[in-house]
């Protein structure tokens, strides 16, 4: 099978690895891939509620993340796409957030993204596949009490732009910059760090359609950057 055969050519998503696919945007992406005729494979700390192939892994563990990618590719027989939707946060002033919690945000959001993509690249190069990284509007604009999250997501932005230049002509790379969404991401935060009760946030299912759009572009055609935010997004511009 050549790089232009199969799912990429008929504009279906194919075999897609989704990190953080047990909840939120990742879960919505996994279902969107399945509904579009693709085969999602989820990597997460917990099992997804939907019946999709998955493996439990802590993406902060570089070796475990890379090994999980290899097993996923072996089980699916190929990789046509990777979506790095896993993400955590630790809100609060820099001096108040425990160092371990702060560093875990960077380990999962940035280093975990790099570990997964690094392990997936050889498989994606064989299929002219796609990478969609998930940053945030807080990867473009900084807010107080969000040093860990901003550091990780600004890092994802830079990583993705450099990756796109590095793999041009071999792997399609898309940077997704989502605004606020109705997910469990904000659960457990102190009230001052939660969206207001009347906040107008996007549905993850709608944002997942933007991811699907990027995944289904033919080789040589790339959606390099997608910013998908509520029309009243407070963190953008």
Where are these regions (language model features)?
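Substrate-binding pocket helix/loop in short-chain dehydrogenase/reductase
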Residues: 93-94, 101-103
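Canonical Rossmann dinucleotide-binding motif of NAD(H)/NADP(H)-dependent dehydrogenases/reductases
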Residues: 3, 7-41
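Active-site helix of classical SDR
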Residues: 117, 152
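Conserved NAD(P)H cofactor-binding loop of Rossmann-fold oxidoreductase domains
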Residues: 85-90
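Residue(s) in the substrate-gating loop at a strand-loop-helix junction
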Residues: 136
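C-terminal helical subdomain
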Residues: 169, 175-176, 195-236
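The beta1-alpha1 cofactor-binding region of Rossmann-like NAD(H)/NADP(H)-dependent oxidoreductases
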Residues: 57-67, 99
